[in-house]
Each structure stands twice: as structure tokens, then as C-alpha cells.
């Protein structure tokens, strides 16, 4: 299969894992004969011959990945429906003062029914941790003074605990609907609410997906996260080409569509022309721009705000998938040579972020985010499984970069290059993981007494801790752990 070729002769290379292309029998064949036809059925690659050896070296990881994605594909809709029912039930209990209040309201015929999209309908993430206020600065000044960086300055400088708290709370708030976000930003945070954008994104793969797209002189990037930013579609690998070249503009994307009247994302040439005009005029985020995908929507709005506020800087942040998109956003800005915007970037904070690319990608971004002054911090809590995915091994070569701020279950911060147990594998880690999950459950019952009512965990959060006894890496991914780490964290004295 030919690679996607650029005008200067360089090639885009890619590997797409397609679990839907084979059945269970093919999965078995992939396990037994990793270099056979059964294995090749699942892979679309620009250099298939080279990848055969890599599949053979890590066959069990490949097989488990394919099986998990097949299960997710089968159970996707039922899980979505179940999630909606659970979320509605939790909101029903919340707006009626929990179970006893709901029973009383049923007797009185005065049941409050939650409605999606309103300021009282909270996401599951928000129900796990109900805190809305930002960190109290007076409480911050009473205790710890060492945090993240030795830099000190006025206002929200990198390394300031208030800034990190704002980032982690913004990451939590991003799971909510527009009305909830607007209410919290205006009433609790006393800040200006810019807007809420429901960007169109194609289906993105899970962290168990090992598909990648390689940009010459930049490195390999996880395809699922590129899709989530709206920068391509694995159904047509050529679609990434137009978005990932230097000086990419929406006009150039339109000109690349030589057949028919639609772009690789289903947008008409006339629509793209209107979007391009809006970008050139720094106008506003129209519905057409919002639909075009997250990257262009955010870049347009950010450019407009930076023009209005000449001395302003901005921070990019996110949790889990949002963390992956947070670090890829400045990466694509650099690729597109948006140096004026990059010059206004204060930093990037991610929480529980999965790996987004290979070692070369990290080396490409180091001059912009790591050296000479670190501006990219990955916050990792204890046994959180997500930062350990996709696996970092010799077959797939996914690597983290930037400064890792690792917090153990005592909320002690360690500044490291890589979190311990980087692939969440190994018998020697298994028993400590389960013991730690038990400690976290016990800790959750005591937090309200040891640290004050602000840190008291509700029944739903404690239930998640109980589930964590069976799946410790999943419960550790909760934002409650990250908020507590930011607010209670103390710097390790041994490092």
C-alpha cells in the first residue's frame, strides 16, 4: 500500500488497526500465526511488511487490544443507554435530596424530575465530586509553599497552586453541559463566560487502540486523538494530509477536494469558503465553524480573544482524552507555524493523560514546551491506568514527554520523567495495587474528618472506591484524586 506523499517528496506513514475486519477465528489466528493472513486482516498499513515482525513481538498486546475493542463495539450502545439511565437516576436522587427525600416527595406528589441540558443536571463526573469553588487562597497560604516549580511571580504564573487548581477544576467542568458551565463560571468563579462549543468529531478510538499517523520530521501521533480534534478520518487516511501540513488553511483543504462537492468531513466547498472568510476576518465562531471540528473552533476563538486582550496569555488543560487533546493542540499550532499564538501560551497542564505519540514527537515539541523553561506538566495520580496507555514497548513506541508530576496515595508529589510501572504490568506491582486500592477506600471514609468537610466523599464516590478494589487502575483515574492531589499535595523531600 502506498504512503501519502507530500509535495516535497516526504511521506506520511500510518498504521490503522481495524477490529471490525475479522472475526474471533481471525483473532485466534493472529495469536498463533501473527505473520499470517488472519493477522493482516486487522491492519491497514503504509508499510505492512515492516509491521509483521512487530505484531509477532507483541502478539498478546495486539490480541487483547483487538478483543477489547470488539467488546466495546458490541456493548457500546447498551453501555451508553445504561450510562444515561444511571446518570438520570443519580440526578433524580440529587435534586430530590437523595433517597429519603425522593420517597417523601413521591408520597407528597412533589417529585422533581431532572431535565438534561439544564443547570441542575450534572454529569456523572460532577456527581462523583461535587466541589464547584476554586481553591481558597488563604487556605493555600497557611500550609505548603513548595509546588511543581521553583518559579515565583505575581498572579497566575506556571507553578502557582491557584493556577493548577483552576486547570483541574476546568478539566472537571468540561464534562458538564453549557448551562452548568455558565452557572459555575459566573456565580462561583466570578469570571467572564466566553462560550460553549459542541464541536463535531468523528468516532475516536479508545486508549487500547494502537493506530498511528506519522508526520515527516514530527513523529507518530495517535490517530484516535487526531480524529477527536477533527483533523482527519481513519476511513480515508488521506484526509489527515490536508490538516497536518505546515501553513494548513481551510482554503487549502477545500482545494484538495478534487472530486465532488464535499470535503473529507462532509463539508461543502461553499461552507469551507465561509469558514475561511470568518477566520481571515477574526469574526466569530459561527455554527459552520463549530461544526468543522474542535481544533479550528478553538483556534479561531483564541485568536480573536488574544487580539482583544494584548497582554493576555492562555493555558490549555484537560483530563483523560481532554488531556491528550490539550497537548496535541499546541503541537498542531507549531506544525501550522502559528508562532504568534504559541508566544502567548503560558503552559499546558494535563491530568491522567494517555500517551499521544512516539519519542520523536516529544523531541519535536521540546524546544517549544520543555526547554529552556518547562511549560508542559503531566499530572499523574498513583495507579491511574490511563497515563500508562497505549503501551510503551518496542512494537508501538508510544512515549510520554514533558515534566511528570506524580502523586502517590499520600498526595506526595514526585517530579519524574516517567510514572512508576509505566505499562501497568508485572506481578510485583499487582499486590501493591490492590493494597493501595483498599487504603484509598479507607482514606475516603476519613477524609472529611482529617481534612475538613470540603474533602468529605459522598456515597457515590465511595461506591467507586469499592469497585476500585477489583479494578484499582480505573478508580484511580477519578478527578477526585487529582483535585485532592493539587490542593493537598506536598513536595517530596527525598527528590
Model-derived features: positions:
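Non-catalytic, mobile gating and regulatory segments of ester bond hydrolases
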Residues: 2-317, 321-495
Amino acid at each position: 500500500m502506498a504512503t501519502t506523499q507530500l509535495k516535497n517528496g516526504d511521506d506520511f506513514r500510518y498504521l490503522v488497526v481495524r477490529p471490525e475486519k475479522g472475526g474471533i477465528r481471525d483473532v485466534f489466528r493472529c495469536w498463533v500465526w501473527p505473520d499470517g493472513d488472519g493477522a493482516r486482516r486487522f491492519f491497514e498499513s503504509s508499510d505492512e511488511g515492516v509491521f509483521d515482525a512487530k505484531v509477532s513481538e507483541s502478539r498478546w498486546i495486539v490480541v487483547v487490544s483487538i478483543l477489547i475493542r470488539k467488546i466495546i463495539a458490541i456493548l457500546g450502545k447498551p453501555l451508553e443507554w445504561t450510562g444515561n439511565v444511571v446518570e438520570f437516576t443519580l440526578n433524580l436522587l440529587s435534586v430530590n435530596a437523595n433517597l429519603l427525600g425522593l420517597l417523601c416527595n413521591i408520597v407528597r406528589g412533589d417529585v422533581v424530575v431532572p431535565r438534561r441540558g439544564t443547570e441542575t443536571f450534572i454529569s456523572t463526573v460532577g456527581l462523583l465530586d461535587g466541589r464547584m469553588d476554586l481553591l481558597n487562597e488563604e487556605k493555600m497560604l497557611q500550609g505548603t509553599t513548595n509546588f511543581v516549580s521553583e518559579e515565583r511571580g505575581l498572579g497566575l504564573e506556571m507553578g502557582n497552586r491557584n493556577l493548577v487548581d483552576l486547570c483541574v477544576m476546568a478539566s472537571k467542568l468540561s464534562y458538564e453541559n453549557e448551562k452548568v458551565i455558565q452557572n459555575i463560571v459566573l456565580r462561583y468563579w466570578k469570571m467572564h463566560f466566553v462560550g460553549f462549543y459542541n464541536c463535531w468529531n468523528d468516532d475516536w478510538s479508545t486508549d487500547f487502540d494502537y493506530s498511528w499517523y506519522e508526520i515527516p520530521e514530527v513523529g507518530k501521533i495517535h490517530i484516535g486523538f487526531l480524529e477527536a480534534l477533527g483533523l482527519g478520518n481513519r476511513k480515508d487516511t488521506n484526509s489527515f494530509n490536508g490538516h497536518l501540513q505546515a501553513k494548513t488553511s481551510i482554503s487549502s483543504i477545500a482545494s484538495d477536494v478534487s472530486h465532488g462537492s464535499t470535503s473529507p468531513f462532509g463539508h461543502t466547498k461553499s461552507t469551507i469558503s465561509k469558514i475561511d472568510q470568518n477566520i481571515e476576518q477574526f469574526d466569530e465562531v459561527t455554527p459552520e465553524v463549530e461544526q468543522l471540528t474542535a481544533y479550528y473552533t478553538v483556534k479561531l476563538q483564541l485568536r480573536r480573544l488574544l487580539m482583544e486582550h494584548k497582554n493576555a496569555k492562555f493555558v490549555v488543560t484537560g483530563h483523560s482524552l481532554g488531556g491528550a487533546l490539550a497537548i496535541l493542540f499546541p503541537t498542531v499550532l507549531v506544525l501550522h507555524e502559528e508562532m504568534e499564538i504559541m508566544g502567548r501560551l503560558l503552559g499546558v497542564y494535563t491530568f491522567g493523560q494517555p500517551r499521544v505519540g512516539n519519542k520523536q514527537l516529544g523531541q519535536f515539541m521540546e524546544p517549544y514546551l520543555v526547554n529552556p523553561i518547562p511549560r508542559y506538566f503531566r499530572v499523574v495520580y498513583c495507579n491511574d491506568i490511563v497515563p500508562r496507555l497505549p503501551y510503551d514497548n518496542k512494537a508501538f513506541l508510544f512515549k510520554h514527554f514533558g515534566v511528570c508530576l506524580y502523586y502517590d496515595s499520600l498526595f506526595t508529589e514526585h517530579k519524574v520523567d516517567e510514572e512508576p510501572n509505566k505499562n501497568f504490568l508485572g506481578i510485583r506491582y499487582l499486590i501493591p495495587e490492590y493494597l493501595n486500592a483498599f487504603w484509598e477506600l479507607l482514606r475516603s471514609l476519613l477524609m472529611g474528618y482529617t481534612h475538613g468537610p470540603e474533602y468529605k466523599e459522598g456515597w457515590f464516590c465511595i461506591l467507586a472506591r469499592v469497585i476500585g478494589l477489583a479494578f484499582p487502575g480505573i478508580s484511580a483515574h477519578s478527578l477526585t484524586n487529582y483535585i485532592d492531589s493539587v490542593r493537598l499535595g506536598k513536595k517530596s523531600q527525598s527528590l
